[in-house]
UniProtKB/Swiss-Prot annotation:
PANTHER family: MITOCHONDRIAL 28S RIBOSOMAL PROTEIN S6, SMALL RIBOSOMAL SUBUNIT PROTEIN BS6M. It comes from the Bacteria. Keywords: Ribonucleoprotein, Ribosomal protein, RNA-binding, rRNA-binding. This is Small ribosomal subunit protein bS6. One of its GO terms (molecular function) is small ribosomal subunit rRNA binding. HAMAP family: Ribosomal_bS6. GO terms for cellular component: cytoplasm; ribonucleoprotein complex; ribosome. The gene is rpsF. NCBIfam families: S6. The keyword Cytoplasm does not apply.
Length: 96
């Protein structure tokens, strides 16, 4: 098991009250695979440094989790398939 930090930028048109439940739906991949979600920090709507898909803002969320590399890759893949997710970045903070 490795520690990961996942940053997710969601479409700003998503209702901010539904961000946490939709993240839980994705994070269930980690929980069912034997990993753990250590912390979920929703930053809210922020201005982007540059436009992504003609959007100037996004809803930021940072998730700290512990999982196997395969589970982390599967989570990143599923997030990439969702249209409400503008961008994701998955890193290992202990490796940098």
């Amino acid at each position: 098991m490795r520690n990961y930090e996942l940053m997710i930028i969601l479409d700003p048109e998503v209702d901010e009250r539904t961000v946490a439940p939709s993240l839980d739906k994705f994070l269930s991949v980690i929980k069912t695979g034997g990993g753990s979600v250590d912390n979920v920090d929703i930053w809210g709507k922020r201005r982007l440094a540059y436009e992504i898909n003609k959007r100037a803002e996004g809803i930021y969320a940072v998730v700290n989790l512990t999982a196997t590399p395969d589970l982390a890759k599967e989570l990143d893949r599923q997030l990439g398939l969702n249209e409400a997710v503008l961008r994701t970045k998955l890193i290992r903070p202990d490796a940098h």
